[in-house]
Structure formats: C-alpha cells, structure tokens
C-alpha cells in the first residue's frame, strides 16, 4: 500500500514522518514493475489496482458497522485515523455515498493517543436465561447490584473512590429460539418498555420485528468506568515548510496538485482538491471534487462538492 501510494505521488518520499524518514521510491517502482510485468499491465495501473482492492476491503468493514446494522452511511460523516487514513478517506466516502469526512488533529497517532487518554473501564456479564416477562424489576436490581459489588471491589484495588465510578447497565436480549442477542441499555425507568426497545432495535438491525414472540433475557451486563479529568493536549504542531505546488502523475492524466503543511492552513481557509496535505504523523490525499477546512477544534473537515468541467 505504501509503495502504491508512493508511486502514484500521494506520499512524498522526502516528507515521510515530517522528513524524518526518506522513502526509496526507486525500490518501490522496481517492486511494482516486477509484478506489473507478470500481470501485463503498467506500473500505474497496478498501483491503482492495489489501492482499489485495499479500499474495497475497507468498505466491507464500514458496511459491517453501518448498512448491516440498519444505518445509512449517507446520514453520517466519515471519521478516519491512522497514518494512512487520510490517503483513502475521500475514496471511501465516495464509495459509501457520503458527502463529508473529518480527519482529527493528530489522526496518525490517534489510537496511541486514545490509549493514553482512555478512561479505565471494567466490563462484567452474568448469564441469566429467562423470559423477560418472568423476571421482576427487583430481581434485575439484585443481579445488577451483585455485579456492581464485584466491580467496585476490583476497582478499589486500584485505589479508586466510589464517587469517581460511572455505571452503565444493559441487557442482552433475543427472541425465544434465536441464537444471537442484541444489547439494550437498561435503567429503572425503562423496565416497563424494555421489550419495546428490543423490538425497535431488532427492526433497525434486521428490518423486521416479532412482536408476538416472547423476548428472552440472556445476559445482564454492567460497565464501570473510572471518571478522569480530560485535557486538550497538542502533540504535533511543528510546521515543516510553506505551501508549494508540484505536478504529480496519475493514471493517464497529469494534474497540478497543491502540496502544503496542515499546520500552515489557517482556520476557515478553504483548500480545493486535488491537494496533498502533509503533517508529521500522516498524509491526506484530497481528491478532485473535495475541499477542506480547519475547524475551531483544529480538525480537518472535508466536503464533497461539484466539479465544474471547463
């Protein structure tokens, strides 16, 4: 993938990791040429094919968390992360018919940053298979209290005060006879309509509901989270150089592409694609037909727009 993006000019060999690592484009071209000759295609065709295959796999993963769960991707904004996320976000959004995307600040190290900032959490589950109509509110409370007691004891070993722990309750439910469950949030004021919430969730996920079939409780679930004070840290702010332009070759065409540092983009300034937006921990390939702005949170907001053919 890196070789393919490098050969297509979407990654600058001299700007990888903010210039801290130089990529060998000649070796990348040689590797692609070897395979391209066996497949009887050009180097650029192979590079585009590699990226297309990879993006199709990414689309499958996005389908699994959207369409397959009853959500229309077009109703959402695509958020990407990772060093290569910005290289593919425009194409992925187009494949999902999405009109906007967000590349968070420090997106290239977002996972690592998230691990450092994430709140400590414990998940507890107790299996208790019974028809929902046959268990009382008092019995559910007893089950949750048992899990909360167990969880609190574990968290106290980390010297956490009870007042800093947030509790979230939920139930794994299914229609009687099913082998899979849906997790439904639970609170005291939901005890009378929990079955209705399950029917609605089943409708959203699978397109139908079985209101005449008994709803069965399978698991009682508890999530305990240690509340911690969050801060807005800035990881990478160094500007490498001013905006420049260069001509990069895409399959069968040449386009003048703006190359600039993300940190040099002013809040509210509009960048029109095609453009390459560089930063120390990632690269963004802004395709033709897309524009980008930095918002008040220093996130890069991408929007799809109509291309005027001259």
Please state what every model-predicted region is.
Residues 1-73, 80, 85-310:
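C-terminal, non-catalytic interaction/recognition modules in large multi-subunit enzymes and RNPs
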């Amino acid at each position: 993938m890196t070789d393919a993006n490098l050969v297509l000019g979407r990654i600058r060999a001299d700007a990888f990791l903010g210039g801290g690592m130089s990529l060998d484009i000649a070796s990348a071209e040689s590797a692609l040429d070897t395979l391209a000759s066996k497949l009887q295609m050009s180097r650029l065709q192979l590079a585009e094919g590699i990226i297309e295959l990879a993006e199709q796999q990414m689309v499958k993963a996005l389908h699994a968390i959207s369409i397959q769960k009853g959500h229309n991707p077009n109703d959402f904004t695509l958020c990407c992360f990772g060093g290569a996320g910005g290289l593919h976000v425009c194409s992925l959004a187009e494949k999902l018919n999405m009109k906007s995307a967000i590349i968070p600040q420090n997106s290239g190290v977002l996972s690592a940053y998230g691990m450092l900032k994430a709140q400590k959490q414990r998940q507890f589950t107790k299996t208790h298979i019974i028809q929902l109509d046959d268990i009382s509110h008092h019995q559910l409370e007893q089950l949750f209290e048992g899990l909360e007691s167990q969880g609190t004891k574990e968290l106290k070993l980390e010297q956490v005060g009870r007042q800093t722990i947030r509790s979230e309750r939920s139930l794994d439910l299914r229609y009687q006879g099913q082998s899979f469950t849906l997790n439904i949030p639970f609170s005291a004021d939901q005890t009378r309509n929990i079955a209705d919430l399950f029917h609605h969730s089943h409708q959203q996920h699978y397109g139908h509901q079985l209101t005449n079939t008994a709803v069965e409780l399978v698991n009682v679930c508890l999530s305990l989270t240690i509340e911690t004070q969050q801060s807005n840290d800035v990881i990478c702010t160094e500007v490498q150089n001013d905006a420049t332009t260069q001509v990069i070759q895409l399959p069968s065409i040449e386009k003048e592409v703006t190359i600039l540092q993300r940190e040099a983009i002013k809040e509210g300034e509009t960048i029109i694609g095609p453009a390459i937006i560089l930063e120390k921990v990632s690269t963004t390939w802004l395709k033709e037909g897309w524009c980008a702005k930095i918002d008040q949170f220093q996130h890069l907001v991408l929007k799809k727009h109509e291309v005027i053919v001259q």
